[in-house]
Structure formats: structure tokens, C-alpha cells
Curated annotation (Swiss-Prot):
Keywords: Ribonucleoprotein, Ribosomal protein. This is Small ribosomal subunit protein uS9. GO terms for cellular component: cytosolic small ribosomal subunit. The gene is rpsI. Pfam families: Ribosomal_S9. GO terms for biological process: translation. It comes from the Bacteria. Belongs to the universal ribosomal protein uS9 family. GO terms for molecular function: RNA binding; structural constituent of ribosome.
Amino acid sequence: MAQVQYYGTGRRKSSVARVRLVPGEGRVIINGRDFENYIPFAALREVVKQPLVATETLGNYDVLVNVNGGGYTGQAGAIRHGIARALLKADPEYRLTLKRAGLLTRDARMKERKKYGLKGARRAPQFSKR
């Protein structure tokens, strides 16, 4: 018998997460490692769990994630986005809950590029009056 799986792709900054939800007991596996070992900060682990907490499905699915690009914050945001999209495929009734929590919106904020003549994106070289 084929097992039911729900897929979702999440993006944040330069990170892309491919998320697979499988009915299970609530394990979160990121790149083959348990998410407590993969994400070192408790606050970011909470970010990853937000869609499951919002829809009250924390112990219902095993979450299998492949994520690459970016750092911890970008990856956590991408995983959150991917889980939210996968939950939406699992049950379309979650749309209102996830949308109100702002979990279906792709966070479009990206690093601003460095401009020539400046030291960073906006930082100008030191000004000397004399």
C-alpha cells in the first residue's frame, strides 16, 4: 500500500527547503539529521514548528526536509514556509489559519547589493571636511 505524502517547497533569503510530510509521530528530520542537532538555536527551532503548532498537528506528521543555501535563519524560514505549504496540501481547511499567522507568505526581504563608490549597500566612505 502506498503511503500518503504531502510535498511543499519553501524559500527564504537564499535558502530553499523541499519538505515532505508523512503521517507519523512528529519527528523532524533535516538533511538526514534530527532537527535538535541541525538547528543550534531554540528560537529557530520554534520558528520551524510554528505551522504545526498553529494547525495543532504537532504529533501527527513526520517532517522530512532537504534544505540548502543560506544560513540558519534563512534555512529555518524556508523550512517553515515549506511545512506550511505541505500542510495546505494535506488539508485545504488550514488555509485561513496559516494565512492569518502569516505562514503562507514568502518573505521577500533579501540582502541589498553593494553599490560602487560605497563601502557597503548604503555605507558611504568617511567624509572629511578638511
